[in-house]
UniProtKB/Swiss-Prot annotation:
Gene Ontology molecular functions: DNA binding
Disulfide pattern: none
Role of this protein: Protamines substitute for histones in the chromatin of sperm during the haploid phase of spermatogenesis. They compact sperm DNA into a highly condensed, stable and inactive complex.
Region Disordered, residue ranges: 1-61
GO term, biological process aspect, one: chromosome condensation
Name by which UniProt lists this protein: Sperm protamine P1
Keyword Iron: no
Main location: nucleus
Compartment(s) of residence: Nucleus; Chromosome
Organism from which the protein derives: Dasyurus hallucatus (Northern quoll)
Similarity remark: Belongs to the protamine P1 family.
InterPro entries registered for this protein in UniProt: Protamine_P1
Any one Gene Ontology cellular component term annotated for this protein: nucleus
Record keyword Nucleus present: yes
C-alpha cells in the first residue's frame, strides 16, 4: 500500500505540473485574445446602430 500511495502522489504531481504549464500558455493566449476583442468592441460601439440594422435585415431574410 505504501508503494501505491507513493505512485499516486507522483502522478498527481505530474498532472499538476502539466496543468500549470497549460495555464501559463492559456494566460498568454488569453491576453492576446483580450486585446483583440477590446479593439473589436471599441469599433462595435462606434458602429452599434449600423450593426443592429444589419442584424434586423438578416432576421427578416
Amino acid at each position: 500500500m505504501a508503494r501505491y500511495r507513493r505512485r499516486s502522489r507522483s502522478r498527481s504531481r505530474s498532472r499538476y505540473r502539466r496543468r500549470r504549464r497549460r495555464r501559463s500558455r492559456g494566460r498568454r493566449r488569453r491576453t492576446y485574445r483580450r486585446s483583440r476583442r477590446h479593439s473589436r468592441r471599441r469599433r462595435g460601439r462606434r458602429r452599434g446602430y449600423s450593426r443592429r440594422r444589419y442584424s434586423r435585415r438578416g432576421r427578416r431574410r
